[in-house]
Amino acid sequence: MPKLARKQQKNLIQNIAVQRMQRLFELAKAEFPENPERSRRYVQLIRNISMRNRISIPRDIKSRICKHCYAFLVPGSNARYRLKNGYLVISCEQCGKEMRYPYKKLK
């Protein structure tokens, strides 16, 4: 198999994996109000796809998943969002861990 074909095949597999992660994220978002355990399972599947294909989880998905207990985070339901000292602090209500993301202040 030529090298170019192998690279194209790898890119195709990565694109399919990202599409599946996006779809599972949408399903987790829709399923959370009725069945939070199913949304947690969808998050586990997202992580499995990411690890199996050795690609990173997209940023918009990664910011909605707890880095400690891997719960699907919904503001006001099981997560608390606060702005403190130039950071967005997301607190998971299930495990109590905090994640901090810097944000740029307007001058």
Curated annotation (Swiss-Prot):
<feature type="binding site">
    <location>
        <position position="95"/>
    </location>
    <ligand>
        <name>Zn(2+)</name>
    </ligand>
</feature>
<keyword id="KW-0255">Endonuclease</keyword>
<protein>
    <recommendedName>
        <fullName>Ribonuclease P protein component 4</fullName>
        <ecNumber>3.1.26.5</ecNumber>
    </recommendedName>
</protein>
<keyword id="KW-0378">Hydrolase</keyword>
<comment type="similarity">
    <text>Belongs to the eukaryotic/archaeal RNase P protein component 4 family.</text>
</comment>
<feature type="binding site">
    <location>
        <position position="66"/>
    </location>
    <ligand>
        <name>Zn(2+)</name>
    </ligand>
</feature>
<dbReference type="GO" id="GO:0030677">
    <property type="term" value="C:ribonuclease P complex"/>
</dbReference>
<comment type="subunit">
    <text>Consists of a catalytic RNA component and at least 4-5 protein subunits.</text>
</comment>
<keyword id="KW-0963">Cytoplasm</keyword>
<comment type="function">
    <text>Part of ribonuclease P, a protein complex that generates mature tRNA molecules by cleaving their 5'-ends.</text>
</comment>
<keyword id="KW-0540">Nuclease</keyword>
<dbReference type="InterPro" id="IPR007175">
    <property type="entry name" value="Rpr2/Snm1/Rpp21"/>
</dbReference>
<dbReference type="GO" id="GO:0005737">
    <property type="term" value="C:cytoplasm"/>
</dbReference>
<dbReference type="GO" id="GO:0008270">
    <property type="term" value="F:zinc ion binding"/>
</dbReference>
<feature type="binding site">
    <location>
        <position position="92"/>
    </location>
    <ligand>
        <name>Zn(2+)</name>
    </ligand>
</feature>
<keyword id="KW-0479">Metal-binding</keyword>
<dbReference type="InterPro" id="IPR016432">
    <property type="entry name" value="RNP4"/>
</dbReference>
<dbReference type="GO" id="GO:0001682">
    <property type="term" value="P:tRNA 5'-leader removal"/>
</dbReference>
<keyword id="KW-0819">tRNA processing</keyword>
<keyword id="KW-0862">Zinc</keyword>
<dbReference type="GO" id="GO:0004526">
    <property type="term" value="F:ribonuclease P activity"/>
</dbReference>
<feature type="binding site">
    <location>
        <position position="69"/>
    </location>
    <ligand>
        <name>Zn(2+)</name>
    </ligand>
</feature>
<dbReference type="Pfam" id="PF04032">
    <property type="entry name" value="Rpr2"/>
</dbReference>
